[in-house]
Regions:
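Short, C-terminally biased terminal segments at protein or domain edges
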Residues: 1-128
Length: 128
């Protein structure tokens, strides 16, 4: 069974590609152009930051990149929700939101694990 790291890496790459394809299909207007630009930036940044985290040289660097990836995910959700009302293809946009939700849940699990480890380490240090 593939580990969570591999699954998240592959999921973020696939998600980025799907967002790119979705945006390429959209007819650009004065209204949706800035939203599409922001969506492309934030959606592809999730995977880029996760890739950096996965290759981090320290736990602190890993933690920082994971938190950045999660922030980019929150921004991506915002832009996808706006696009849902603007797109001529709401089914494709909803599919992206569904895929996104799985990525967000996995990132949240990583963040929770980091928080739990940090709390355990703090308790261990305090008990010395």
């Amino acid at each position: 069974m593939p580990d969570r790291s591999y699954i998240l890496r592959e999921s973020t790459v696939a998600f980025s590609k799907n967002v790119i394809e979705f945006c390429k299909q959209e007819k650009l207007t004065a209204v949706n152009r800035p939203i599409i630009d922001q969506l492309l930036r934030s959606a592809t940044s999730i995977g880029a930051n996760y890739a950096e985290a996965d290759n981090a040289g320290s736990r602190t660097d890993f933690r920082n990149k994971i938190f950045i990836a999660k922030k980019e995910a929150a921004e991506t959700k915002y832009w996808l929700n706006l696009m849902l009302d603007l797109t001529a293809n709401p089914v494709a946009c909803q599919r992206l939101l569904t895929d996104f939700h799985h990525i967000l849940m996995t990132l949240q699990k990583v963040v929770n694990t980091l928080a739990n480890r940090s709390q355990s380490a703090a308790k261990h240090t305090a008990n010395r």
